[in-house]
Amino acid sequence: MTTRTTVKLAALALLAAAGLAAPGTAQAQGDLVVYCTVQEEWCRAMVQAFEKKTGIKVAMTRKSSGELYAQIKAESANPKGDVWWGGTGDPHLQAAEEGLSLEYKSPMLGELHPWAVKQWEQSKQRTVGVYAGALGYGYNTKQAAEKKLPELKCWSDLLNPKLKDEVQVADPNSSGTSYTLLATVVQLMGEDKGFDYMKKLHKNINQYTKSGAAPAKAVSLGETTAGITFQHDMVTFVVQGAPIQVVAPCEGTGYEIGSMTLIKGARNLENAKKWYDWALTPEAQSIGAEAKAYQVPSNKNAKAPKEAPDFSKIKFIDYDFAKYGSSAERKRLLAKWDAEVKNLPK
């Protein structure tokens, strides 16, 4: 038996012992069903800490934000989940607009940064910010040197012909990260020029992944030269020693407010509220760094990991969460991307 197989089997045994569901599944039984949209390690660590603190048994499903939004919508007549934790804020806002979530005022609101509370206010109390992350990209410095690429600093640098079939990004239909990219480019450049950029970028794309964080791993392994993700996803692999340069694009960039939502029709609502309140505490928000996740936490008393991107050095656009978090605008932009970009020949 290989070491990799042994480790995998051991991990599965630990999951079973902890009462967690395997990735992408949810157990039928349980005192709480959590839909999770951060990396698997962070999801597991949160569940284990909550179970230890409360004694409440948790069944967890991990999927990308676009997938979970679609799942919650599909299950709305017979909800299976109780709380949706993590993932880009736009799909959470869309769920709120469509009446898929519940109003809730947590006693922890007073401890949160204004941007987290604004998310709650904008959603009419149906979702709240739990962390923030800056959009950007990363590139494998060894591969860049082999291709004799200049230092990459801007969005425009990803259009270099030397990067043909060497850039990876998620599909915005399934990934909140990639939808944030689409909305960012449209706001930064204007819609016509923004879609022109996406068409030119398409020529260099080798794969549209399902998960927004997947390109970071691909860059770390040398499977692609560059990947567009949230910057903290790249930092995770930089900390592990991967030859990655993280880029905050010179033209400016968008950002996410990772959010949390109580699902309308939750079968375990009181336990879901306990998770919601606990997930906003400094104690819970410190778990991200322990799981090698480097987002900026929403609780003012929680310390941002020292490895987290320095927001003071990043040029941010004035991201319009109200407009681009609406269901109508999301559907319109995705339909346009599908029609004008996704199936273009390379």
Stretch-by-stretch model annotation:
Residues 29-94:
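Early extracytoplasmic/lumenal segment of secretory-pathway proteins
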